[in-house]
UniProtKB/Swiss-Prot annotation:
The modification N5-methylglutamine is found at residue 150. Methylated by PrmB. Part of the 50S ribosomal subunit. Forms a cluster with proteins L14 and L19. One of its GO terms (cellular component) is cytosolic large ribosomal subunit. Keywords: Methylation, Ribonucleoprotein, Ribosomal protein, RNA-binding, rRNA-binding. This is Large ribosomal subunit protein uL3. Disulfide bonds: none annotated. Belongs to the universal ribosomal protein uL3 family. GO terms for biological process: translation. SUPFAM superfamilies: Translation proteins (SSF50447). Gene3D superfamilies: 3.30.160.810, Translation factors.
Length: 209
């Protein structure tokens, strides 16, 4: 089953009949329009390409305009692709709504996390700080040793150090689907999802469900 592209609206909470409060993220999933269908013969794999939302005409490049015109759909704010499983069929120009998730219990949500800028090891990797006193005057928040000796004589790849924090692709898995509101194109999932309000999100049925 393919996924859909939506927009993060924000967080709120809803109450069950028992009065239990459930924190939910509201995702607006406008109709996803099929712009291209890829097949084994021409592309070597089966996939469907979709767009959603709208883009100002003066922001659409000529190649994009041609691509959307060929598909017969309105220019959207981006292009996304989902692999097709055996038996799944879609046609160019088809519109896919949030009702796709009507019978789905759990989803995986992918987005771009909020950027935090250049961060030290304490903030970025939750390192412990060093002594506040007892002879320590300048090294309270430094990481300490980052390697060994002449052997191996290098810093290993992946070593946790200071650097850019956030603003990276993140996937949160197995979030419960609380409600599917097809009338208002809304999907409510339990808990938080990556990214700032208004960012694009890719919602797929959970792989571990």
């Amino acid at each position: 089953m393919i996924g859909l592209v939506g927009k993060k609206v924000g967080m709120t909470r809803i109450f069950t009949e028992d009065g239990v409060s459930i924190p939910v993220t509201v995702i607006e999933v406008e109709a996803n329009r099929v712009t291209q269908v890829k097949d084994l013969a021409n592309d070597g794999y089966r996939a469907v390409q979709v767009t959603t939302g709208v883009k100002k005409a003066n922001r659409v490049t000529k190649p994009e305009a041609g691509h959307f015109a060929k598909a017969g759909v309105e220019a959207g704010r981006g292009l996304w692709e989902f692999r097709l499983a055996e038996g799944e069929e879609y046609t160019v120009g088809q519109s896919i709504s949030v009702e796709l998730f009507a019978d789905v219990k759990k989803v995986d949500v992918t987005g771009t996390s909020k950027g935090k800028g250049f961060a030290g090891t304490v903030k970025r990797w939750n390192f412990r700080t060093q002594d506040a006193t007892h002879g320590n005057s300048l090294s309270h928040r430094v990481p300490g040793s980052i390697g060994q000796n002449q052997t191996p004589g290098k810093v290993f790849k992946g070593k946790k150090m200071a650097g850019q924090m956030g603003n990276e692709r993140v996937t949160v898995q197995s979030l419960d689907v609380v409600r599917v509101d097809a009338e208002r194109n809304l999907l409510l999932v339990k808990g938080g999802v990556p990214g700032a309000t208004g960012c694009d999100l890719i919602v797929k049925p959970a792989v571990k469900a």
